[in-house]
């Protein structure tokens, strides 16, 4: 049953490990197989803000979409964003400048491969600098959360 659930996105198993403080998580899902970061960026109409060629071709194995303001105020364990693997994309919505998510990621020992800002107001230079320092691909998209989920379901 666990393997079947995992093969279909892992929602049931993920919900078994869910915490009361995960109201910030809009969606979390694992992919059946790895997908190159470039494919994901193309599918969500993303614009790369930071990241070099060798990182862009690496695979990711899932994603998490999170409300950045709720995450800052409700998460006790930042690692709850990672699901089965940190080789994933973390989407942050409600981003104004992009500093807070990148500072939180920098402070945590486990890093995602990709950070994607959903409809950010603007991106501060500090956010891109932190992404470069941590070797994280930083992307922005104008897709909303529903559009992102619809597109990413194709990867399963």
What are these regions (language model features)?
Residues 2-98, 141, 146-156:
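Non-catalytic interface/targeting segments
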Residues 8, 110-111, 132-135:
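Short, structured coil segments at secondary-structure junctions
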Residues 38, 104, 128:
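Short glycine-/small-residue-rich flexible loop motifs, especially phosphate/cofactor-binding loops
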Residues 90-91, 114-118, 136-142:
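Short hydrophobic alpha-helical runs that function as membrane-insertion/retention elements
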Residues 97, 120-121:
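Short alpha-helix boundary/capping motifs
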Residues 99-101, 124:
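Amphipathic coiled-coil/heptad-repeat helices and related helical stalk/stem segments
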Residues 104-116:
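Mid-chain, well-packed structural core segment of small domains
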Residues 122-129:
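Short, glycine/polar-rich helix-capping loops at beta-to-alpha or helix-loop-helix junctions
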């Amino acid at each position: 049953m666990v393997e079947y659930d995992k093969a279909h996105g892992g929602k049931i198993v993920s919900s078994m490990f869910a915490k009361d403080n995960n109201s910030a998580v809009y969606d979390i899902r694992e992919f059946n197989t790895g997908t190159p970061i470039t494919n994901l960026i193309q599918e969500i109409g993303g614009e790369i803000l930071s990241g070099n060629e060798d990182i862009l071709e690496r695979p990711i194995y899932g994603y998490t979409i999170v409300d950045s303001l709720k995450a800052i105020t409700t998460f006790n364990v930042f690692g709850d964003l990672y699901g089965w693997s940190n080789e994933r994309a973390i989407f942050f919505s409600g981003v104004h400048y992009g500093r807070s998510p990148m500072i939180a990621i920098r402070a945590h020992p486990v890093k995602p491969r990709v950070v994607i800002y959903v409809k950010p107001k603007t991106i501060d230079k500090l956010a891109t600098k932190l992404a470069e320092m941590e070797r994280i691909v930083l992307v922005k998209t104008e897709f909303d959360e529903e559009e992102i989920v619809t597109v990413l379901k194709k990867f399963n």
